[in-house]
């Protein structure tokens, strides 16, 4: 929205400076996008006097002029047809900024003759569109006077208007807001009905079906005859030119002026070209309209038009028609003022791709109560500027219902806006904005004005109070510090996080692989059942839900080995699918190690990964999950995809909770992966739940000051007895003194009886309160021997 300072002051009685108005506009939500003050660029121009104007010696259309600048005589080459001796002109001397080009004037030669200045047109100063010749000034002006001293320049202000503030698409609406803000007083708008001198020969009708009556609920007009459609007065031209509009003729300029001055689009028809009455109706499919913009439009049903007996003459609220447009020869006009439905107007404009000043206002909802008053004001201006006489007004329809009553509770201003405003101040603000305010049991009863259709509820009134009271008056309040949020992770999610961190700590790299795989691989790992096939796989070789996480990890190791990464460790936490029904999926922590566990080194030989690496990984994951690894049994059995002699199962009672070991060499060959590869699978949901909360602090570490001591035991056992059974039996012999048990030797040979083996363990004793005597040590040793014998049948070797 553009307007000039003088234009604003025609509605606002104020002594505020341009800077104060700029600040005030932004403060009330009408953001200033720019201010164009012509005087900033016109300080170098002076009044010049042409003393001589002779023909250029080398150009027929150029003149060689002697111009008095007040400080000396300059030679100026000029091509303007009206350049002549005795003329007072606007003179630019070298070093002057030229607004139209943005250049600084320099001396130069034109067809071999030096030109020491430039005589300017209004267009070159961006003060108008006239560029047919140089500007002609009053001959009484003093030569050498600054242009700033002889002319007044009106700054142009451009603001950004939000879609809900259609009232501020008129200068009066902006002035009203500034007056409410305290930057002056709103001047009264006097609407005096124009008495009709005769009855209009053109009537108005509304021809809508009942369901379409909202398209145009009110249509008013009047016939004005004997008009003279000449040029507009200079003040009107200046205002339109300042905001970028081109003055056309008095009648057209008046309608454009009302659109920007009072946010009331109007239209004038050449009455001599209108046949019969003017009616508002819906268009018929296939009708056409030649618009004032030079384009022809094919109309559709549902579009509102203004028509006569011959057909459409205008698109309602959007564009006038060329046929009934006014020209210099027009002597009789019909003035139209109406209210058109915003939704239909917007839909028609979008459909036909027309964006006009009228559409821009009507589709946002202009003042429905200002139809007839605007017609009276426009009639008076036409009579004043164009002469003639007006008929009696003709009106069809009624004013649409716009009245609303809203209760404003004063405390809501503080609750929603965060600022304390007195009830009296609220009432003053709302009254200044045009609202009718009365007392109410709950606070204030407010009736918004007709031009504020955007005020529909209490919160809108709160916004108006806060806006006019000043956003700067809202105290700065820091945001409340949020409390420490409570943990939202489930126990299972926390357990997964602990395991994930532990495996990463052990050097394994986390991966995320597909939850499906080729059927052939699924079969190798105990899956591939028909019910596990995908109905719509993303790829033909990813057609089965995975029965294990290991296949994807093993094949990933193979791809890495092909690219030179032969030694690596991978892990993944994700589901494996045992069946298609809910509850037939298990959360698994799986991992693999491939290649060498330890690289080449001068002190230690390289070593390939083996089942014990996988066992260490799975036991560390068990501990990280909050379970006690010592409570699990290791059984020398595993699924078929593990090496039959280098694998094992972790059991809790009779329930498997995980597998570990080297991957079967035959399976690796089928997958084209070079071994060895060791892996593990831990079923997290099968582990016992923690007895203590994860956030519970660990007990204080009490390190014993007494020296530990080791005792070795060798047992003769049946070859089928697992070493783990011996270790568990020895550890449980005395849980207070025994801190660790480890296997350090295994012998099966000629010196042992058939079906027998020798297993040696070392037991670490850690006293806590006193040094152990020989008797204490012997007693613990006896307990260990007895416990192993009872659990495994083993005998202590001599």
Swiss-Prot record:
What cellular-component terms does GO give this entry? phenylalanine-tRNA ligase complex
What biological-process GO terms show up in the record?
A: phenylalanyl-tRNA aminoacylation
The entry's localization annotation reads: Cytoplasm
Q: Where does Mg(2+) bind?
A: 454, 460, 463-464
Quote the InterPro entries the UniProt record gives.
aa-tRNA-synth_II/BPL/LPL (IPR045864), B3/B4_tRNA-bd (IPR005146), DNA-bd_dom_put_sf (IPR009061), Fdx_antiC-bd (IPR005121), Fdx_antiC-bd_sf (IPR036690), NA-bd_OB-fold (IPR012340), Phe-tRNA-ligase_IIc_bsu (IPR045060), Phe-tRNA-ligase_IIc_bsu_bact (IPR004532)
Q: Please share the entry's free-text remark on the cofactor.
A: Binds 2 magnesium ions per tetramer.
The alphabetical list of record keywords is: Aminoacyl-tRNA synthetase, ATP-binding, Cytoplasm, Ligase, Magnesium, Metal-binding, Nucleotide-binding, Protein biosynthesis, RNA-binding, tRNA-binding
As for family, the record states: Belongs to the phenylalanyl-tRNA synthetase beta subunit family. Type 1 subfamily.
Record's protein name = Phenylalanine--tRNA ligase beta subunit
